[in-house]
Amino acid sequence: MNRRSCAFIFVTGGVSSSIGKGLTTSALASLMQSMGFRVCIRKMDPYLNVDPGTMSPLQHGEVFVTEDGTEADLDLGHYERFTGINCTHRDSTTAGRIYVDLIERERNGEYLGATVQVIPHVTNLIKDFIYSGSDQYDVILCEIGGTVGDIEGQPFFESARQVAYEVGKENVIYIHLTLVPYLEASGELKTKPSQHSVKALNALGIQPDFLICRTQSAQMSAADKRKIALFCNIREGNVIEAQDVDNIYKIPLIYKEQGLDTKISALLGCGPLEAGVSHWKEIVGRTRSLANSGKKLFVAIIGKYSGLCDAYISVDSALQHAAFAVGVNLSVQIIDARGKDMSDLSKFDMILIPGGFGNNGIDGKLLAITHARINNIPFLGICFGFQLAILEFARNVVGIKDADSTEFNKNCKAPVICFLDEWHRSDSSVERRRQSSQVGGTMRLGGYNCVLKKESKAYAIYNETEVISERHRHRYEANPHYLPELEAKGMLFSGYSEKGCDIPEILELKDHPWFLGVQFHPEFKSRIFKPHPLFLSFVRAGLLRKYS
């Protein structure tokens, strides 16, 4: 379905943050894909950080890394997993990035002495981001982070208003998500917060075309929808209910059942097209049957951000993708490496240590690695987990008692993990970093090739592919000086960076059924319809150990 001009769908939220804008945007994009539209999804975050790379996962959830090395909001992970389309730097921005660009332009004299203001200068830069590459798509879906009424979000809402003015309202749709709370004491749903949220949006010059009402257990009545439609000046049929679900892949089906797909296509002047959802029905049906499966695995994610499940959302998703493909019910528990739950890991069939930074909780993580190594429990270490697996092995097997990482101890006597100061980009140019560089600028980010050793477990897992590509986010690496000692005791480094610097990328233990560490982040490339081979093999190893 090729439209003569690109349409823009803006997804906004009110009443509460974390209301599901990213999942709604992802689900809508997948529905529009199935109708034949060429879609693109973009995220605009109003916070003043240039990117989320230096933000605490406890505040903002995980940092998602795109193929081109962009550190982005976790919603881009949802976008990729629902649509299968890889996002780039053109699909994510923040108020901080916009203002940095603005100040640089002003300092370079690009505004020719004009008084630089929010309107038109900031809004013009935001619109440049929105319009970028629009000739390649039929529909661009733009999610505005935060909630209506946030002071830092006003330039983004104003830009969304201006887009309709510039391209014509017939080419723009506004979708607003609100929370409809249920008061147990009175036994009723309350619509007033939604009314006030839409009123605040109206004050910014935007009248939503659709209102998606998030509810919990109580279902909205026809009277509730009529009331909201009347007070919010929205067609009754365009008031969509979105109840909490136990499986996010039900969301496209929920919107399809209420005709959101046909209503959007009709509003865009393309007729009442219908989305194909048979693939989502299959996913939901199979996951429902897995919940009743007799085979169940328990996996522990040992981290330090246990207070927020979104901190490891891509890892959890990748595990569930693999479990779905293998046909096993998987229970994932995030364990605080500093907490009392570390005292008993015997109930877990698999152990995973994800990416992270700093020495907080490393003792617990090292204990978990030792437990997995000694007891032949399937183990996967990702990024920081890869480095800690080397550290544990160096101390407890090789006998390097002073083994440490310069991340924790800059003056350590045996730096088995050290600062990564040079590597080759995909275009063969050399990237260099110093420890004195800005914190946000010392990472090796994005997709890089890795060469696998034949006859290794990794080579078999990747279907005997000699060169693979994975996404990275790290500033420390295994110190090549210590690799011979480690390999002499049974640790095989089965993957290395492809060009020039020979950075160790994959480790495995020769005398362990399944013990792997990877310097990269395989979770970022896993999809529900194409699970990542490492996670598939990891889950199969857990299944084999428990049920063989």
UniProtKB/Swiss-Prot annotation:
Matching InterPro entries: Class_I_gatase-like (IPR029062), CTP_synthase (IPR004468), CTP_synthase_N (IPR017456), GATASE (IPR017926), GATase1_CTP_Synthase (IPR033828), P-loop_NTPase (IPR027417)
SUPFAM superfamilies membership: Class I glutamine amidotransferase-like, P-loop containing nucleoside triphosphate hydrolases
Root EC class: ligase
PROSITE patterns for this protein: GATASE_TYPE_1
Binding annotation for CTP: S17, D150, I151, E152, K190, T191, K192, P193, S194, Q195, K227
Binding of L-glutamine, residues: G356, F384, G385, F386, Q387, E407, R475
Region listing for Amidoligase domain, in residue ranges: 1-270
Note: CTPSs have evolved a hybrid strategy for distinguishing between UTP and CTP. The overlapping regions of the product feedback inhibitory and substrate sites recognize a common feature in both compounds, the triphosphate moiety. To differentiate isosteric substrate and product pyrimidine rings, an additional pocket far from the expected kinase/ligase catalytic site, specifically recognizes the cytosine and ribose portions of the product inhibitor.
Stated role: Catalyzes the ATP-dependent amination of UTP to CTP with either L-glutamine or ammonia as the source of nitrogen. Regulates intracellular CTP levels through interactions with the four ribonucleotide triphosphates.
Protein name listed in UniProt: CTP synthase
Organism: Neorickettsia sennetsu (strain ATCC VR-367 / Miyayama)
